[in-house]
């Protein structure tokens, strides 16, 4: 047993300079786990509650000292003496201590910090790398890195309406080859933008964030960059979008403020269809607002046999919302963010529910990140086949990509790159 001996939380900073929670958990056998909690910029309304202090005179109200206090004074006394390896019992206890549907008392950032720290301590106690501890002997598939090389929306002061333009290097034999291709396209894109006289400053996730005349301009520049880097758009490298449409949806009018005009759902659906007919787009995240269940079901029915539709704000890594989507036929892919649901156990439950019902899963970072690399190990452990963790720039993003390189090397000949198989809905189109 990895009996918990001590738990201690402190306030640290994330990649945007905002406070977040760090938890250190020690076990009696000498193992130690570190839990670092990320934070999002565009967040779903149904996400688990992130506890902030609210004192505007300190960090603009974004301090997390109350969440730290919840760990040190409420959670720690209850979990000391428990087996850190009994992840479900530990997480269930913290959820029970909180007693709210959205972790609205202790805070998801408090609970997740302890949950992650226990996970790491247990892996160290067992003498296993995290991906092997979580996934057992079957974790062997390296995910396709969906790399956010152009930032817009809430990640870049709305340089474009669409929040993320990602490249997906699926047409390669190994993860390391795919990563190299993505990096080369990223650097080539910088030169393409410079030649056009555009700003090459970076957004929250390391992608370029120039102000564009239209959302489609970004796609054209990315296509140019893929070709200029010596790769074939569509065959080797596809495009994924995170529209994050809830960010420009008006609840009062039921319309989307898109490309400077008020657009209804029917227009947006047609727009997406035209877009995928013109560009090698294989995945669209949050094409409709987070409560637009009928619109989600409509686009999945119409285009779901040729495109991956990823639920982020819609599903918030919540098994209950995912089950509703399954019942309605809304979306066909789950975005996985640990802090959206707030515990390791619930995250794993969501992935398993998605897999059992034919949904793909894309493990994801947040815009406010730390050097933590849990999501890299998680993607391999559960063979999710996809990960998104920003551009190949900024240390907190690159750390995740580098961790996958390490795992690929450790796995040796048993490592398999997901490649085309990552995009189940697009298989017959990618085969062309």
From Swiss-Prot:
What EC designation does it have? 4.2.1.11
Which cofactors are named for this entry?
Answer: Mg(2+)
Biological process terms from the Gene Ontology for this record are: glycolytic process
Q: What class of enzyme is it?
A: lyase
Gene Ontology CC terms: cell surface; extracellular region; phosphopyruvate hydratase complex
Its pathway, per UniProt, is: Carbohydrate degradation; glycolysis; pyruvate from D-glyceraldehyde 3-phosphate: step 4/5
* Compartment(s): Cytoplasm; Secreted; Cell surface
Gene Ontology MF term list:
magnesium ion binding; phosphopyruvate hydratase activity
- Record's keyword terms, sorted: Cytoplasm, Glycolysis, Lyase, Magnesium, Metal-binding, Secreted
Record's catalysed reaction(s) = (2R)-2-phosphoglycerate = phosphoenolpyruvate + H2O
Q: Which InterPro entries does the protein's record reference? A: Enolase, Enolase-like_C_sf, Enolase-like_N, Enolase_C, Enolase_CS, Enolase_N
Residues at the catalytic site? 205, 337
Specify where it is mainly localized: cytoplasm
Residue ranges crossing the lipid bilayer per the database entry: none
Q: Name one Pfam family in it.
A: Enolase_C
Q: Which family does it belong to?
A: Belongs to the enolase family.
Q: What protein name does the entry list? A: Enolase
Q: Which classification does the entry list for the species?
A: Bacteria, Bacillati, Actinomycetota, Actinomycetes, Bifidobacteriales
Q: Which gene encodes it?
A: eno
């Amino acid at each position: 047993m990895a009996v918990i001996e001590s738990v201690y939380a402190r306030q640290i900073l994330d990649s945007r300079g905002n406070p977040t929670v760090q938890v250190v958990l020690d076990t009696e056998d000498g193992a130690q786990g570190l839990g670092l909690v990320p934070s999002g910029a565009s967040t779903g309304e149904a996400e688990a509650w992130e506890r902030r202090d609210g004192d505007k005179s300190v960090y603009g109200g974004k301090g997390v000292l109350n969440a730290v206090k919840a760990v040190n004074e409420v959670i720690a006394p209850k979990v000391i003496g428990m087996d850190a390896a009994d992840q479900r019992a530990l997480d269930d206890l913290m959820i029970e201590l909180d007693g709210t549907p959205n972790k609205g008392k202790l805070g998801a950032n408090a609970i997740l910090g302890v949950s992650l720290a226990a996970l790491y301590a247990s892996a160290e106690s067992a003498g296993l790398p995290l991906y092997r501890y979580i996934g057992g002997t079957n974790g062997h598939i390296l995910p396709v890195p969906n790399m956010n090389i152009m930032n817009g929306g809430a990640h870049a002061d709305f340089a474009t309406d669409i929040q993320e333009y990602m490249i997906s290097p699926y047409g390669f034999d190994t993860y390391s080859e795919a990563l190299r291709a993505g990096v080369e396209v990223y650097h080539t894109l910088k030169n393409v933008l410079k030649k056009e006289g555009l700003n090459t400053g970076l957004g929250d996730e390391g992608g370029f964030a120039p102000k564009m005349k239209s959302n489609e301009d970004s796609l054209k520049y990315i296509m140019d960059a893929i070709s200029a880097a010596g790769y074939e758009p569509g065959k080797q490298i596809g495009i994924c979008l995170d529209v994050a449409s809830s960010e420009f949806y008006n609840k009062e009018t039921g319309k989307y403020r898109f490309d400077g005009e008020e657009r209804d759902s029917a227009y947006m659906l047609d727009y997406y269809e035209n877009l995928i007919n013109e560009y090698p787009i294989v995945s669209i995240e949050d094409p409709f607002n987070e409560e637009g269940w009928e619109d989600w079901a409509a686009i999945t029915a119409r285009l779901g046999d040729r495109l991956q539709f990823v639920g982020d704000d819609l599903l918030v890594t919540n098994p209950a919302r995912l089950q509703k989507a399954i019942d309605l036929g809304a979306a066909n892919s789950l975005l996985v963010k640990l802090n959206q649901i707030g515990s390791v156990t619930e995250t794993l439950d969501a992935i398993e529910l998605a897999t059992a019902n034919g949904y793909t899963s894309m493990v994801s970072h947040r815009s406010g990140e730390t050097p933590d690399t849990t999501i890299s190990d998680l993607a391999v452990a559960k063979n999710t086949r996809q990960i998104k963790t920003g551009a190949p720039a900024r240390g907190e993003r690159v750390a995740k990509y580098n961790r996958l390189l390490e795992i690929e090397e450790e796995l040796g000949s048993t490592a398999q790159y997901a490649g085309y198989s990552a995009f189940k809905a697009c298989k017959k189109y990618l085969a062309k």
